[in-house]
Amino acid sequence: MPELPEVETTRRGIAPHIAGWRIVDVRVREARLRWPVPADLGETLTGRRLTDVRRRGKYLLLDFDEGTLIAHLGMSGSLRICKPGFPPRKHDHVDLVFEGDICLRYHDPRRFGCLLWTAEPPERHPLLAALGPEPLDKAFDGAHLHRLAAGRNTAVKSFIMDSRVVAGVGNIYANEALFRAGIHPARPAGKISLARYRNLGEHIAEVLAASIEQGGTTLRDFVNESGAPGYFKQVLRVYDRAGQPCRVCGEPIRCVRLGQRATYYCPRCQR
């Protein structure tokens, strides 16, 4: 699943090509995504100028002169820049055609993503209204995590993956941040000290920023806006490394199911 770094990589890649241009055509080849593409999306978007491309958690916000298109890449989605006449591949479901012979193409084999229009400020949309702070913003730190964790018995990994606590920390980066902070993923969230949460908050931001610089993580489906893979997988310390030696102590990395998600940790380094 594309996580925050992959979505941010996409945002940085597509924005220079489409910001400031008007939509001249919308082509919907398959409307059945997680939520159906609005039937009147073409009528709504045609003639509107794109003013900005933002990210909120794992959502991309395409701001037009009036209204916003909210995009989520789901489990396997991607957005790429191409020429409008470039033949669509299988699973290329939606084209946004801009002035200047530019096309933003939405590709999603599993169709778990979405493209939704809102005329209101997107921050009020039900998908975004309850999101926690951005993990790369100054408003997010370990004190925020410690405050929300008080009295909670849920596993800390599930806690930091709750988008109401912090927006956009997915499975890959939760595993990696907890390893760097030396915290066992199953430890109850309410039984972790402020000092350890401060350390964890720093590592969450650190691992996300490092992945963005590497263009994201390629595991199965993710490629960036140009079709190139991300490279952060090459430096993953625990994720997808079950049975391999810990890069710090040599102990074999273990994998368990936690909250129905594959969870990787070092039994020696993480307590």
From Swiss-Prot:
**What's the domain of life for this entry?**
Bacteria
| Cofactor comment | Binds 1 zinc ion per subunit.
Point out which parts of the chain are FPG-type zinc fingers, as ranges.
237-271
Q: Which InterPro entries match?
A: DNA_glyclase/AP_lyase_DNA-bd, DNA_glyclase_Znf_dom_DNA_BS, Formamido-pyr_DNA_Glyclase, FPG_cat, MutM-like_N-ter, Ribosomal_uS13-like_H2TH, Znf_DNA_glyclase/AP_lyase, Znf_FPG/IleRS
Q: Which reaction does it catalyse?
A: Hydrolysis of DNA containing ring-opened 7-methylguanine residues, releasing 2,6-diamino-4-hydroxy-5-(N-methyl)formamidopyrimidine; 2'-deoxyribonucleotide-(2'-deoxyribose 5'-phosphate)-2'-deoxyribonucleotide-DNA = a 3'-end 2'-deoxyribonucleotide-(2,3-dehydro-2,3-deoxyribose 5'-phosphate)-DNA + a 5'-end 5'-phospho-2'-deoxyribonucleoside-DNA + H(+)
The entry's keywords: DNA damage, DNA repair, DNA-binding, Glycosidase, Hydrolase, Lyase, Metal-binding, Multifunctional enzyme, Zinc, Zinc-finger
Q: Which GO terms describe its molecular function?
A: 8-oxo-7,8-dihydroguanine DNA N-glycosylase activity; class I DNA-(apurinic or apyrimidinic site) endonuclease activity; damaged DNA binding; zinc ion binding
Active site positions, chain numbering: P2 (schiff-base intermediate with dna), E3 (proton donor), K58 (proton donor), R261 (proton donor)
EC number(s): the record gives: 3.2.2.23, 4.2.99.18
Per UniProt, DNA binds at: H91, R110, R152
Q: Name one GO biological process term.
A: base-excision repair
Q: Which cofactor does it need?
A: Zn(2+)
The record's annotation in CDD domains points to:
EcFpg-like_N
Report quaternary structure and partners. Monomer.
State the family it belongs to: Belongs to the FPG family.
State the protein's purpose.
Involved in base excision repair of DNA damaged by oxidation or by mutagenic agents. Acts as a DNA glycosylase that recognizes and removes damaged bases. Has a preference for oxidized purines, such as 7,8-dihydro-8-oxoguanine (8-oxoG). Has AP (apurinic/apyrimidinic) lyase activity and introduces nicks in the DNA strand. Cleaves the DNA backbone by beta-delta elimination to generate a single-strand break at the site of the removed base with both 3'- and 5'-phosphates.
The protein's name in its UniProt record: Formamidopyrimidine-DNA glycosylase
Task: Tell me what organism the protein belongs to.
Answer: Methylococcus capsulatus (strain ATCC 33009 / NCIMB 11132 / Bath)
Taxonomic placement: Bacteria, Pseudomonadati, Pseudomonadota, Gammaproteobacteria, Methylococcales
Protein's gene:
mutM
